[in-house]
């Protein structure tokens, strides 16, 4: 006699292993039930062990997924082995293809699970924007200088050689050279200006006057150029000197007159190198807004050249006709009060303001390196102009004599 429980088990086994039509539905039902049982057992295990370990959870979930795929593979193979006995080959093949497509879709779902990311999308976008801004910020000074060159306002020794050559060609037409000579003769007769020095000579001459940099930073001396720089900062609505604002600045207020911007920028470069530590620590608001490079070029360099102007033209006699000494008098150089005298500095400021045109037209087109003098003379010969009359060499020799 068969017990009730045994009969039920036989019926269940028959439902699972029968080759009759519809047995595939029973198999799917069993697979779904088995799947839920696996999840239930696994959830119970996770609740009792390592509930707070994300890495172990992920490992168990991965193993469960692999087990499910393996069970489905085995069940599918067993089912098709049974079905192949009762169905034609074409129907069996079609069923196999359908099952394989379903299996591939399930595997794709498992593979396409997104990885956990520490950064949110909005955080990533903000970082990208910040990096782009930093990269753009690095281009500001170069763009500003290049735009100023196009306006014939500025020349930087840091430009690439092709930029220098194109600018020199632009300023070397016959008409410009003739005009340059006219401007030179006019200003030399009116102000008795000193000769233009080459860059190495200029840096050697202005070196004793560079301590004014620290005195300006420490507020020990008032500065006309610092005053103009501070006004530009206060009138700005931006946190730093932008390209647009730089283009709108009146550079005549930040130019050391007859020395020209080309030599002024060379002095600014030297100041930035020598006083890098002081310029990067405890920066005043005006310096931060301008940036170290521009602050050195348009504030500290012209102030240094102002002191040098007082010495070169001997403004202590309140006359621009005094003969320029060849060497620095040590006694005067050691007395800052002499060069910091407000009356003397006002005389120098006025002279530099009155000779800005000379600096732009004459000084900035004169050779700044000694080897450039030969190029200048070759250009004069090409234009069939008298070398002795038009070259800058003549004015350096005549002035020294």
Curated annotation (Swiss-Prot):
Q: Where is the composition biased (Basic and acidic residues)?
A: 35-48
Identify residues that carry Phosphoserine. Answer: 23
Stretches the record annotates as Disordered: 35-59
Q: Tell me a GO cellular component.
A: nucleus
Question: Which InterPro entries does this one have?
Answer: RTC4, RTC4_C
The UniProt family comment states:
Belongs to the RTC4 family.
Protein's UniProt name: Restriction of telomere capping protein 4
What lineage is on file?
Eukaryota, Fungi, Dikarya, Ascomycota, Saccharomycotina
């Amino acid at each position: 006699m068969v017990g009730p429980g045994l009969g039920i088990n036989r019926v269940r086994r028959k439902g699972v292993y029968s080759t009759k039509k519809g047995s595939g539905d029973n198999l799917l039902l069993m697979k779904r039930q088995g799947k839920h049982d696996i999840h239930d057992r696994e959830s119970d295990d996770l609740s009792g062990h390592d509930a707070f370990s994300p890495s172990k959870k992920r490992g168990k979930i991965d193993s469960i997924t692999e087990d499910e795929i393996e069970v489905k593979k085995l069940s599918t193979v067993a089912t098709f082995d049974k079905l192949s006995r009762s169905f034609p080959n074409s129907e069996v093949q079609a069923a196999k293809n359908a099952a394989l497509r379903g299996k591939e879709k399930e595997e794709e779902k498992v593979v396409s699970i997104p990885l956990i990311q520490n950064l949110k999308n909005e955080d990533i976008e903000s970082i990208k924007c910040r990096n782009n801004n930093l990269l753009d910020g690095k281009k500001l000074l170069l763009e500003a200088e290049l735009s100023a060159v196009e306006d014939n306002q500025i020349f930087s020794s840091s430009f690439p050689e092709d930029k220098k050559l194109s600018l020199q060609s632009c300023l070397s037409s016959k008409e410009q050279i003739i005009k340059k000579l006219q401007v030179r003769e006019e200003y030399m007769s009116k102000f008795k200006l000193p000769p233009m020095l080459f860059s190495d000579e200029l840096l050697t001459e202005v070196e004793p006057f560079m301590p004014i940099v620290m005195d300006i930073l420490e507020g020990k001396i008032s500065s006309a150029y610092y005053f103009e720089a501070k006004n530009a900062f206060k009138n700005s609505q931006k946190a730093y000197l932008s390209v647009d604002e730089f283009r709108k600045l009146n550079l005549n207020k930040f130019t050391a007159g007859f020395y020209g911007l080309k030599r002024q920028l060379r002095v600014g470069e030297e100041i930035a190198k020598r006083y890098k530590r002081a310029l990067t620590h405890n920066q005043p608001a005006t310096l931060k807004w301008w940036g170290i490079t521009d602050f050195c070029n348009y504030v500290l360099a012209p102030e240094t050249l102002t002191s040098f102007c007082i010495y070169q033209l001997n403004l202590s006699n309140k006359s621009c006709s005094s003969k320029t000494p060849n060497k620095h008098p040590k006694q005067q150089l050691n007395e800052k009060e002499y060069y910091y005298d407000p009356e003397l500095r006002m005389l120098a400021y006025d002279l530099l303001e009155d000779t800005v045109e000379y600096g732009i037209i004459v000084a900035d087109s004169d050779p700044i390196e000694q080897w450039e003098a030969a190029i200048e003379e070759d250009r004069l010969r090409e234009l069939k102009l008298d070398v002795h009359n038009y070259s800058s060499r003549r004015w350096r020799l005549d002035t020294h004599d």
